[in-house]
């Protein structure tokens, strides 16, 4: 994987770049739709390409390990062959999912024992077998296995957690460097900066990660309940240290406002389930604000969902989408998911264009407040 830093905003740390993988190029800043089990919920790949304009999607190691399982994925020739997506894929290590299983997991220095949320069967993840699993899945970008401490962890727990994450990171890189890709194309490993909301721990973690010289670096453990301003502060602390010539990935974030604020602070890559999850619950993001399509106010509004959006937005009206949600038609969730994902991709594409044009901060300031309005 290669990263070319193409433009930097003169009034902020916002950047425009180009990531090149063996499955294609990714223009940054970029939003990556989440395909947890190998699919983006409710959206065909043809729609992801033509309507959403997705350049890269996510898969999740924990979920793919459980279903369909490694035997199926290996026999298929990896996730790209299995699901038919021929553009780049990034896989999360499954750490966040495993550590979310409160009460059904046991943490040890060797790794983490957990029970499947599907059938209760016991499993054990280590840095080594997670690297092996991600090799079998075959994503272009693999994430290191880390502990994801609760957002409100006290300092002592956060420090011990970071020490464990750093030990695991060393083991991840050792295993990654000892093994080869299975399917004839290159894979990259991104380490993850943890440290909760403690500046000194975040700085220590960022230095440790930067010293690995990886193809890119991730910031994890944010947007887990801490105040938004604290999240922005942690991003600033970390990005002062992470190398400027490598892409920076903020994991699991967030709202359109969050994304623009993070871009301004030097973040290049984003993922979040919010566009699809909120879409399935009738909440649509637009440049004017958010719309709850179940509200009666849309019942007689025969204007397009978004006249400046994708073809789906221009084809269907607000009144029709309101009707579909009231009637509990599956098409409602599909239309809303496509709209929201297309809007997120449009947002980061517009941000990139304004970074290149040199007026990103002015553009951001002109739209940031209205993005959060309820229409």
Regions found by a protein language model. Name each.
Residues 1-182, 296:
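Non-catalytic, usually N-terminal nucleic-acid engagement modules in DNA/RNA processing proteins
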Residues 65, 150-151, 225-226, 278-279, ...:
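Short secondary-structure capping/turn micro-motifs that flank functional sites
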Residues 152-155, 159, 216-222, 330-333:
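Glycine- and acidic
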Residues 139, 170, 174-177, 240-243, ...:
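Generic secondary-structure signature for well-ordered alpha-helical cores
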Residues 1-20, 26-33, 41-42, 146-152, ...:
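C-terminal extensions of enzymes
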Residues 163-166, 175, 179, 184-305:
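Glycine-rich phosphate/ribose-binding loops and adjacent secondary-structure elements
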Residues 24, 57, 92, 134, ...:
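Conserved, mostly hydrophobic/aromatic
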Residues 129, 133-136, 160, 164-171, ...:
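A non-catalytic, amphipathic alpha-helix used as a structural packing/dimerization or gating element
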